[in-house]
């Protein structure tokens, strides 16, 4: 989780001043917005709402989303547009409240935007002057007098403006419109609303007229200054332009843009009604003219003010002139054309400004410590700004912090109840501490202040991460080099104390921890053992805590005894609070009247907490002098005041909007950003329904920003901004605010689930990219139509659905924002999705999205690991597993743990590492399929190696649970329907229910001192039945663990000896029990818990079994007799006896499907009875097994009742129930005995344990191959129990440890085929998807490339030494150590003919597949015709490492320091090259694309290029001295330009054979094997690391692919077995690696991810396995044997064909001819047809 060596990051000159200030805690040096990259781009749109509606709508629909996407992808920032007119009703545009809010937000945008901040849209309309919301009393009265003087009617002003004495100075304010018009805003009365709007319009026009005339008069007379008159005479747009552009620097103006639209000759169209919105008009019909006064002001603004700004700066201004249609004026078409151009220009300008003003900053993505410090610094500055009380406590802390000369120094503790101001005091201390110390210790000093508000971040909530971050910050400040931080908490604490000692007089240290009670209890953090009681001389620690939480204050008092070290924050007295309130009000120019003060004093007498005073101030500042207040006007507690604050917000913004907005902020894990809040509210239909109650919804459906602004303004100081990972989030400033919000808005479970779902959908990006979400209406029928998952919709319903669905403009939510797809490792992390999505998915029940949207998402895994959050990945997977209980998640977590070292060092290798480990198990764990497909899709961006078939053995360890010190104490183990829950019984009478994964005891029953003989659960797990030595059955309610009844079991009365219960069994409603040596079976009703009746049998009962339907009981007895009873009536139906009557019935099996009963006696004999007529069963089959001397240990019927497994001490038999025959039989080795055996769930595998061994063995049924022998580390296994509900196996060891094995995972091992011996050689035909392997045995194995399974085995008489294939792979020629050669037809497996006589040293086949060259070391080598076996010629020279030239003319080889070219037609040496000066030829190669050019290396360390045609050296390249000392291999590129030389070291030597230059590329380890791709573009090599570097899983070998063009490693993959052979296919770039256990791994290289290669991966069989819903079993492996008879015997220089040989004997002369014999035969034809197929199926090699 922590970047390595964080302590080594020393502040250096290039580090920013911001960073240094943050690390040292100099908060005053930090800007108000701490993180430049953390601010969003906030653009304020200044425009007249009337004439720019279409432009602003088009920009919102088409341009803003694109700009937002651009900013997120390229800078990791939000792009936000503040357009306060959008979505607001027309009658609100003139509202003074709105204008006031606009100016505040404009100022905020100018200050905080990281990029462009202001866009002005100016047309031909100047706009209305504003109605003032509040006017000072003296000014208002002066205006009133002037109006009277001008003979204006002032009644309206007097009616609508009211004097307010609470204002300082007194003022007149505009009364609320709703109050004055007394309108009921009800949608059922639209006429009333329309009338009100009209009335208001008339009134507002009249008020403006009065103000305008009066102010002008006052201004002319000099009674009012221009600056005062401006607010009455200017329109809103001029104010905004003036504020934004008027007094700014040229640098700042680069971030602003103006778009001016002029309409030519607009005055001509003044009478067209629609043109009224594009210009200011005056007069009435028919004398309507353009308002000359407004036009004059517009010209002044547009043609004078703006050009003046442009002249002195680089302000971007675009002016467009549009011409009206002669009839229609400024028509829709003309406007659309203008809007289209504006949109393009707006987008380009924003991009330009963003790129010019914002720097991409990727550093903060990985610097976790810096981000943590900034979060706390940001909070500190925010909290300190709310600090109001200048109390004595601050002085005490000030004095404590200053360095003293002597005496013990202890931490200082500040404590007090909730809302007493502890956090604000500590924030103020943290803010001032640096300055205090600097002042006290001199200007040369450099103090360090570390502040943490515990519990506000993940890292400050846990002791381990808290100490780690503080230690890292100390190490950076005091320049301490910490190589690695301790893992153990006590070592970390020691490091913390050691780092405290680094402080000095010049560098004093202050550490501030607020809210100790917020620390989690992990590592006993709340016991405070980690807190140093005695501090170094220059260290001060200030702590705060609640007095009664977790006993922390009490523990502190035990640690620190001096009372002087404790400061209690107690409530202030009423007078002081009243004084504070008075000052707060005066700051905002308000006061309370003497009448109101009584109620304020009354409230303060009941509560004087700082927060209550602040809440009271919030309420009182809105009081008006003429409004009545009483005792109920003010709350008397903090909680009530907060509730009152929220309710007042609901009135202002709407109940649903406030409840949902505050609910979302409260429920979000880390808070929400402003943009996220906007997005989420837009997705909430209940909010949008409230907002759109009276208006028709339209695209895009969004919440008008005005509501967000009002919400933030109403909660300013309580809803604060906090910087987390470059994002500014809205969070509660106080835990009490959060509690009240939770209580008010997050109580209803349905609402909670719906809100979590909306947040989850938002972070999943469900509604991004313009996807429309249905806007649910109240009509249930319409809602039914809108159900997207509904039946196939009718056309009209579809049309309605489209009409009623709207784009909410939710942004896309990838895990990372990538600015360049070609550089996948340069990105910004979507931290918001990382921190929020999992949290909400687990709370809204979206399991599939949790699994596939996060945990099985490769992009999430890769990103988390890349940014160093590996441990967070594991904790998130664990959380998802606890929630979903999917075992795939558990396996994935274990898999990730095992590859941790590799993927944290090389994150790019994640996909290949995962694919290797998941491919073998995906058929058993199908949910991992999604992750594998994700790896295929996204993995090749980072690693070009894609495993197609993995041979990796599955590593698996079971869950273990210690039950007792010995197995002798454990009497019974029962699995349950919950895979992680088991029941165990001990002989002491205790029955425990365990959760195996957590090792927790869930519940326990004690059976009153009696020893337990056994226990069973009913099939529905409702009842638990326990047999005891008291001869009683105890019946328990299994769910509640309570005893329901106790029933005594009585048997046949004979003799006086004591007998115990011999056994019992359960049906659905009954328990059946019998005593030792008893002929009676007692039947008990489980529901009522009493005995019903006894079954009386002929002989002593040995076993009882019930039918599946619970109707019949089958009682097995001595003398192999079974009696059948009716369970319902107790009636005896019949008795049957087997003729093998030597023993007793040990087991009974009931096959319901076949209506059969199977009796198994103690000696293993079987009798099968047909029970179709239950009263008269008929014997159908029997087996007498008395000859075998081993007893039956266990027996099992397979789940599908198709097989019976009989485990005896010395053998395991599997019977087919269809034929009643032994299908398979496995015998134990000498001196071994079976304890138990079971079948896997699907019956494919047999699992068994042996006596005195600690291993569980797994056999494959079809092959008998032992797939695995898994060791149980806790001791020898004495018992196996199989779960009937899950594919789980329980084993008990001698040490009393219970292990739970997942058979699904273990049977996955059968997905890997092995030959059993190290692979020595691999052959691939030029075309076709087959691989052949040689492993030093007498077999050649044929592998299917797509599946990775062995298809066939070709057996030979001796050990196979050589093998060659035709290009299609249809014919194979092999030779063995018995001097035999074999020609095989690979499809049919037929050995076509066999040649004996000479031991072969090398086999070669010509490129046209016609001839074979058999090279011998002792006798003459031969060239023979493949079709007939006839000799073409003899080669008398011994050749080594030979090749056939591509023209099929020569065989070229080495002999005694010579390179010889021998003719394939005559066998004579045609060309040769001899070394001079006694040098020898070390190695040679043919150049693939140049058939007659040979490259060889000599011992003189020269590389020679020899032309076979001209017999001359074309080129000679000298290598460095001693270069060939360790030569292992060399490869030549197809064009002969490059040579790759391996020397067994860590270097790849690339030799340019044209220029002679040698380039050395460092490899990832010591190179073991290398291969050049057929096209010469890639080098594939396997390297190994020294044993010291071996990782946990023993992966010391790595497979690497290097691109030769740039020397870059494009893929790496660990090999977890020892490789023995490396081969590449000729077509594509497929890699096949042979391993020492006889398995092979198949990989492909995907360098550029194109469609064809994606299809190639998707169609490989390893992917098809898990694509098919019904997974068919693997094809059977065929075994083909060699011919016993020899067809041809080679002598010295002749061949002798056998009489019965399929090869036709011909003249010796014919053997030299190039044409084949005319005497055809069947064998000849088969070979020929196979060879001809080559011509028909030929396709160019890729």
UniProtKB/Swiss-Prot annotation:
SUPFAM superfamilies assigned to the protein according to its UniProt record, in alphabetical order: DPP6 N-terminal domain-like (SSF82171), P-loop containing nucleoside triphosphate hydrolases (SSF52540), WD40 repeat-like (SSF50978)
PANTHER family reported for this sequence: BETA TRANSDUCIN-RELATED PROTEIN (PTHR19871), NACHT AND WD REPEAT DOMAIN-CONTAINING PROTEIN 2 (PTHR19871:SF39)
UniProt domain NACHT: residue ranges: 410-737
WD repeats: 963-1004, 1007-1046, 1140-1179, 1229-1271, 1272-1311, 1314-1353, 1355-1394, 1396-1434, 1476-1516, 1522-1564, 1614-1653
GO cellular component, one term: synapse
Name used for this protein in its record: NACHT and WD repeat domain-containing protein 2
Keyword Transmembrane belongs to the record: no
Ranges for the LRR repeats: 386-410, 677-698, 724-747, 883-906, 925-953
Keyword Repeat: yes
InterPro entries: Beta-prop_NWD2_C (IPR056534), NACHT-WD_repeat (IPR052752), P-loop_NTPase (IPR027417), WD40/YVTN_repeat-like_dom_sf (IPR015943), WD40_repeat_dom_sf (IPR036322), WD40_rpt (IPR001680)
Coiled coil feature spans: none
Keyword annotations of the record: Leucine-rich repeat, Repeat, WD repeat
One Pfam family this sequence matches: Beta-prop_NWD2_C
Source organism (scientific name): Homo sapiens (Human)
Stored PROSITE patterns: WD_REPEATS_1, WD_REPEATS_REGION
């Amino acid at each position: 989780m922590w970047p390595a060596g964080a302590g080594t990051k020393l502040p250096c000159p290039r580090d920013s001043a911001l960073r240094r200030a943050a690390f040292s805690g100099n908060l005053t040096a930090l800007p108000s917005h701490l993180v430049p990259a953390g601010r969003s781009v906030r653009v304020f749109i200044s425009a007249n709402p009337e004439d720019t509606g279409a432009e602003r709508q088009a920009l919102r629909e088409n341009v803003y989303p694109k700009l937002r996407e651009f900013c997120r992808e390229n800078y990791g920032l939000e792009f936000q547009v503040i357009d306060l007119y959008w979505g607001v009703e027309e009658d609100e545009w003139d509202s003074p409240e709105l204008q006031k809010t606009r100016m505040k937000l404009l100022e905020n945008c100018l200050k905080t935007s990281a990029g462009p901040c202001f866009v002005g849209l100016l047309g031909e309309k100047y706009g209305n002057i504003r109605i003032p919301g509040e006017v000072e009393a003296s000014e208002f009265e002066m205006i009133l007098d002037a109006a009277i003087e001008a003979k204006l009617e002032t009644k309206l002003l007097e009616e609508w403006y009211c004097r307010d004495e609470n204002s300082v100075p007194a003022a007149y304010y505009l009364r609320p419109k709703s109050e004055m018009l007394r309108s009921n805003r009800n949608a059922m009365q639209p006429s009333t609303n329309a009338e009100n709007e009209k009335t208001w319009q008339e009134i507002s026009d009249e008020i403006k007229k009065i103000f305008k005339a009066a102010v002008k008069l006052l201004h002319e007379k000099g009674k009012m200054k221009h600056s005062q008159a401006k607010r009455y005479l200017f329109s809103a747009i001029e104010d905004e332009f003036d504020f934004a552009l008027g007094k700014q620097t040229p640098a700042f103006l680069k971030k602003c843009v103006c778009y001016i639209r002029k309409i030519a000759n607009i005055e001509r169209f003044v009478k067209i009604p629609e043109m009224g919105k594009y210009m200011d008009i005056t007069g009435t019909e028919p004398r309507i003219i353009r308002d000359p006064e407004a036009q004059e002001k517009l010209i002044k603004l547009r043609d004078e003010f703006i050009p003046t700004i442009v002249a002195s700066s680089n302000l971007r201004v675009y002016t467009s002139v549009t011409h009206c249609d002669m009839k229609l004026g400024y028509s829709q078409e003309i406007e659309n054309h203008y809007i289209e151009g504006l949109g393009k220009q707006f987008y380009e300008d924003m991009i330009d400004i963003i790129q010019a003003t914002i720097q991409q900053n990727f550093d903060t993505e990985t610097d976790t410590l810096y981000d943590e410090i900034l979060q706390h610094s940001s909070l500190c500055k925010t909290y300190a700004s709310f600090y109001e009380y200048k109390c004595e406590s601050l002085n005490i802390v000030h004095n404590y912090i200053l360095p003293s000369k002597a005496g013990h120094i202890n931490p200082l503790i500040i404590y007090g109840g909730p809302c007493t101001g502890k956090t604000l005091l500590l924030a103020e201390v943290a803010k001032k501490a640096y300055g205090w110390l600097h002042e006290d210790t001199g200007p040369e000093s450099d103090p360090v202040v570390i502040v943490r508000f515990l519990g506000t971040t993940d890292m400050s909530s846990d002791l381990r991460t808290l100490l780690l971050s503080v230690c890292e910050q100390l190490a950076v400040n005091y320049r301490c080099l910490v190589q690695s931080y301790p893992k153990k908490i006590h070592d970390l604490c020691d490091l913390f104390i050691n780092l405290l000692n680094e402080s000095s007089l010049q560098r004093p240290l202050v550490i501030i921890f607020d809210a100790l009670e917020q620390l989690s209890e992990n590592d006993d953090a709340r016991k405070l053992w980690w807190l140093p009681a005695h501090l170094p001389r220059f260290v001060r620690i200030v702590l705060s805590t609640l007095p009664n939480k977790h006993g922390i204050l009490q523990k502190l008092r035990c640690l620190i005894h001096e009372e002087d070290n404790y400061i209690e924050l107690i409530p202030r007295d009423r007078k002081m609070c009243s004084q504070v309130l008075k000052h707060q009000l005066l700051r905002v120019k308000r006061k309370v009247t003497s009448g109101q003060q009584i109620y304020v004093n009354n409230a303060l007498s009941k509560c004087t907490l700082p927060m209550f005073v602040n809440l009271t101030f919030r309420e009182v500042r809105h009081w008006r002098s003429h409004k009545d207040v009483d005792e109920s006007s003010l709350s008397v507690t903090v909680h009530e005041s907060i509730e009152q604050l929220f309710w007042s917000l609901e009135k202002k913004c709407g109940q649903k909007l406030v409840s949902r907005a505050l609910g979302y902020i409260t429920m979000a894990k880390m808070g929400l950003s402003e943009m996220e809040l906007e997005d989420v509210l837009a997705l909430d239909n209940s909010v949008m329904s409230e907002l759109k109650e009276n208006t028709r919804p339209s695209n895009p459906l969004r919440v008008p920003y005005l509501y967000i602004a009002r919400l933030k303004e109403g909660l300013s100081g309580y809803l604060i901004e906090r910087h987390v990972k470059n994002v500014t989030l809205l969070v509660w400033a106080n835990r009490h605010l959060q509690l009240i919000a939770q209580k008010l808005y997050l109580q209803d479970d349905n609402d909670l689930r719906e809100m979590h779902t909306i947040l989850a959908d938002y972070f999943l990006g469900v509604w991004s990219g313009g996807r429309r979400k249905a806007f649910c209406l109240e009509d249930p029928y319409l809602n039914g139509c809108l159900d997207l998952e509904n039946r196939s919709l009718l056309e009209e319903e579809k049309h309605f659905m489209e009409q009623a669905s709207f784009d909410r403009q939710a942004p896309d939510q990838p895990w990372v924002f990538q600015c360049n797809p070609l550089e996948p490792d340069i990105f910004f992390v979507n931290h918001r999705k990382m921190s929020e999505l999992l949290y909400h998915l687990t709370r809204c029940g979206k399991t599939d999205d949790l699994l596939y949207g996060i945990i099985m998402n490769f992009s999430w895994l890769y990103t988390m690991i890349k940014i160093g959050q590996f441990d967070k990945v594991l904790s998130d997977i664990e959380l998802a597993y606890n929630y979903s209980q999917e075992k795939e998640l558990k396996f994935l977590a274990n898999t990730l743990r095992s590859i941790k070292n590799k993927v944290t060092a090389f994150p790019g290798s994640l996909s290949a590492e995962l694919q290797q480990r998941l491919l073998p198990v995906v058929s058993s764990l199908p949910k991992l399929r999604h992750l594998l497909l994700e790896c295929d899709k996204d993995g090749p961006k980072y690693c070009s190696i894609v495993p197609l078939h993995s041979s990796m053995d599955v590593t698996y360890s079971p869950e273990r649970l210690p039950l007792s010190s010995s197995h002798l104490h454990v009497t019974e183990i029962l699995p349950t329907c919950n895979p992680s829950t088991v029941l165990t019984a001990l002989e002491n009478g205790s029955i425990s229910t365990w959760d195996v994964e957590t090792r927790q005891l869930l519940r326990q029953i004690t059976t009153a001192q009696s020893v337990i003989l056994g226990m069973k659960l009913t099939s529905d797990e409702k009842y638990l039945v326990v047999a005891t030595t008291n001869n009683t059955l105890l019946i328990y309610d299994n769910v509640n663990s309570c005893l329901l009844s106790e029933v005594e079991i009585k048997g046949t009365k004979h003799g006086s000896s004591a007998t115990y219960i011999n056994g019992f069994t359960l049906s659905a409603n009954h328990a059946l029990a019998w005593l030792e040596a008893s002929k009676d079976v007692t039947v008990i009703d489980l529901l009522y818990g009493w005995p019903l009746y006894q079954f009386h049998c002929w002989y002593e009962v040995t076993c009882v079994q019930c039918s599946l339907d619970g109707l019949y009981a089958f009682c097995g007895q001595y003398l192999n007799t079974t009696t059948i009873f009716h369970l319902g009536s107790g009636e005896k139906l019949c008795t049957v006896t087997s003729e093998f009557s030597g023993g007793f019935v040990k087991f009974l099996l009931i096959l319901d499907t076949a209506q059969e009963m199977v009796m198994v006696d103690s000696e293993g004999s079987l009798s099968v009875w047909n029970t179709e007529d239950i009263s008269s069963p008929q014997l159908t089959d029997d087996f007498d097994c008395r000859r075998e001397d081993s007893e039956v240990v266990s027996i099992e019927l397979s789940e599908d009742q198709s097989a019976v497994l009989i485990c005896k001490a010395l053998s395991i038999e599997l019977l087919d129930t269809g034929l009643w025959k032994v299908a398979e039989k496995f015998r134990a080795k000498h001196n071994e005995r079976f304890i138990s055996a079971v079948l896997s769930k699907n019956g494919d595998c047999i699992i068994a344990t042996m006596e005195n061994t600690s291993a569980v063995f797994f056999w494959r049924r079809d092959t008998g191959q032992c797939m695995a022998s898994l060791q149980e580390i806790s001791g020898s296994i004495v018992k196996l129990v199989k779960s009937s509900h899950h594919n789980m196996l329980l084993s008990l060891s001698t040490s009393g440890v219970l292990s739970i094995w997942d058979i699904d995972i273990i049977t996955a091992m059968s997905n890997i085929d092995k030959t059993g011996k190290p692979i020595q050689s691999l052959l691939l035909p030029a075309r076709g998807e087959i691989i052949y392997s040689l492993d030093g045995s007498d077999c050649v194995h044929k592998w299917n490339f797509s599946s990775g399974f062995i298809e066939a085995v070709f057996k030979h008489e001796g050990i196979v030494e050589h093998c060659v294939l035709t290009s299609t792979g249809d014919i194979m020629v092999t030779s063995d150590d018995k001097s035999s050669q074999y020609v095989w037809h690979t499809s049919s497996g037929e050995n076509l003919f066999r040649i004996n006589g000479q031991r072969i040293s090398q086999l070669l086949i010509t490129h046209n597949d016609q001839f074979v060259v058999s090279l011998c070391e002792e006798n003459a080598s031969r060239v023979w015709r493949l079709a007939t076996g006839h000799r073409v010629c003899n080669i008398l020279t011994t050749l080594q490492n030979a090749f056939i030239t591509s023209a099929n003319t020569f065989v070229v080889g080495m002999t005694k320091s010579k390179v010889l070219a021998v003719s394939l037609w005559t066998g004579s040496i045609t060309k040769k090259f001899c070394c001079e000066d006694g040098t020898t030829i070390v190695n040679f190669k043919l150049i693939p694309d140049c058939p007659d050019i040979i490259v060889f290396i000599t011992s003189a360390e020269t590389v020679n290029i020899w032309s076979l045609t001209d017999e001359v050296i074309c080129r000679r390249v000298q290598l460095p001295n001693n270069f060939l000392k360790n030569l292992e291999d060399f490869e030549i590129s197809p064009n002969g330009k490059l040579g790759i030389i391996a020397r067994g070291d860590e270097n790849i030597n690339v030799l340019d054979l044209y220029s002679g230059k040698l380039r050395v590329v460092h490899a990832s380890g010591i190179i073991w094997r290398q291969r050049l791709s057929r096209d010469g573009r890639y080098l594939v090599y396997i390297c190994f690391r020294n044993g010291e570097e071996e990782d946990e899983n023993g992966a010391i070998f790595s497979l690497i692919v290097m691109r030769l063009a740039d020397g870059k490693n494009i893929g790496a993959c660990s090999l977890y077995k020892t490789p023995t052979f490396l081969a590449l296919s000729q077509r594509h770039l497929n890699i096949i690696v042979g391993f020492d256990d006889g398995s092979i791994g198949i990989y492909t290289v995907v360098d550029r991810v194109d469609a064809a290669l994606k299809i190639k991966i998707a169609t490989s069989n390893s992917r098809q396995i898990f694509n098919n819903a019904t997974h068919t079993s693997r094809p059977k492996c065929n075994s083909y044997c060699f011919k016993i008879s020899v067809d041809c015997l080679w002598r010295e220089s002749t061949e002798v064909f056998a009489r019965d040989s399929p090869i036709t004997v011909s003249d010796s002369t014919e053997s030299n001819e190039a044409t084949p014999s005319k005497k055809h035969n069947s064998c000849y034809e088969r070979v020929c047809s196979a060879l001809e197929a080559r011509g028909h199926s030929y396709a160019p090699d890729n």
